Amino acid sequence: MFDVTLLILLGLAALGFVSHNTTVAVSILVLIIVRVTPLSTFFPWIEKQGLTIGIIILTIGVMAPIASGSLPPSTLIHSFFNWKSLVAIAVGVIVSWLGGRGVTLMGSQPQLVAGLLVGTVLGVALFRGVPVGPLIAAGLVSLIVGKQ
């Protein structure tokens, strides 16, 4: 039996490798393994909890320098007195807000996820971008199409 979904996943994984987007490629390969094994029974759980777990892991990675001490408290305090750091804080707030809108949009309009993924892969492949923005991209899309 021909599995179109598997073919699409393989194509997206190939795009991930070609564009040096190993995060996307490895993620898709893991999903392929889940799909073709008895682990496929976990898909409802992955669909429900995957994004939350991913955000938790991402937050751990971002906060690790503070927790490890490699980013000393004095540096954090000084960030409130430098105009460039204040701009960075403001942009961080805006981007976090956009990411929140993106999560809502991806949950309510999952058909947009494929377009966001293809756009991210193309951005990495054609413009030497970095694959960090699907949630932010979804947030920007929500500003255009609405987040319902």
UniProtKB/Swiss-Prot annotation:
Record keywords:
Cell membrane, Membrane, Transmembrane, Transmembrane helix
Q: What stretches pass through the bilayer? A: 14-34, 51-71, 80-100, 121-141
> Gene name?
yeaL
The uppermost taxa in this organism's lineage are:
Bacteria, Pseudomonadati, Pseudomonadota, Gammaproteobacteria, Enterobacterales
What membrane topology does the UniProt entry give?
Multi-pass membrane protein
GO cellular component terms given for this protein? plasma membrane
Q: Where in the cell is it found?
A: Cell membrane
Positions in coiled-coil regions: none
From the Swiss-Prot or TrEMBL record, give the protein name: UPF0756 membrane protein YeaL
Is Ribonucleoprotein found in the keyword set?
no
Q: Which family does it belong to?
A: Belongs to the UPF0756 family.
